[in-house]
């Protein structure tokens, strides 16, 4: 439940930044989907359902958004190329319109952000970097929950420490 609450906090933070005018890029949006799944898995834990599959899906969700955050950080830092759909890499963009550069974006050009652009940093880390780190911590929480669940299944004793 703590890991799901952490995903909810990260997702809420992303929406707050967006409300404050920090428009997300496509890769930022991609990183939100696994958080939504993790939140859903946390909600399912409230019901008497098989716990292990829920914990595994929660862990995979946190790991996937962390991996996306690492990839996005690499794109922002120029360590590797990002998707051409949101970085414009490999194209002569000098003669292209906004709708040609980002066809899936809204017509409001002031809200368009390239995935290779860092729009906010704290302690030299971008939002994507923070998502990668914090989601990695959440993945560890999910994995600890899996280990504890398995320990109870195997030994019949809950670890209350």
Feature-to-residue mapping (PLM):
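Interfacial segments of alpha-helical transmembrane regions
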Residues: 1-5, 47-66, 140
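Loop-to-helix transition at the N-terminal end of transmembrane alpha-helices
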Residues: 22-37
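Membrane-interfacial alpha-helical segments at the cytosolic side of multi-pass membrane proteins
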Residues: 36-48, 136-146
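Extracytosolic (periplasmic/ER-lumenal) interhelical loops and adjacent juxtamembrane/interface segments
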Residues: 77-126
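C-terminal TM-helix exit segments that contain a strictly Trp-centered aromatic cap at the helix terminus
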Residues: 12-18, 64-79, 98
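Immediate flanking context of iron-sulfur cluster ligation sites
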Residues: 4-23, 42-45, 76, 106-107
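Short, Lys/Arg-enriched, Gly/Pro-containing loop segments at transmembrane-helix junctions
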Residues: 151-161
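Transmembrane alpha-helical segments in integral membrane proteins
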Residues: 125-153
